Amino acid sequence: ENTQDSPELPQVSKISVSYNEKNFLFNPEEIDYVEANDGKVFVYVKREQYTGAFRMGELEEKLARFGFFRCHRSYIVNMQKVVELVKWTRNSYSLRLSGYEKTDVPLSKGKIQELRSMYEF
């Protein structure tokens, strides 16, 4: 009897989403940001909106090692896509992503310090 452990299977890191009743698989680095709205989770890739069938917490966990940051309870952003930190008031900021010039992703007050320590601004 073979008691050797089988080699570990590679970690599958694709994220599955749907659009018009079709299913798609994206590599995490293709994803721009994720938004939770009205009980649904939307995944944005190249300005297209897809629907995901998962909770924000589990997605945050899956994406953290790919450079994603939970900047707000309703948003997770791919930090590689962030091009600007927009200041609204003394303690209020949002993030602007490449290709989304008209979309500002909110940054929670509680997350500002975390981001500051990551990027030293």
Located regions from the model:
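Conserved binding/recognition cores within well-folded domains
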Residues: E1-P106
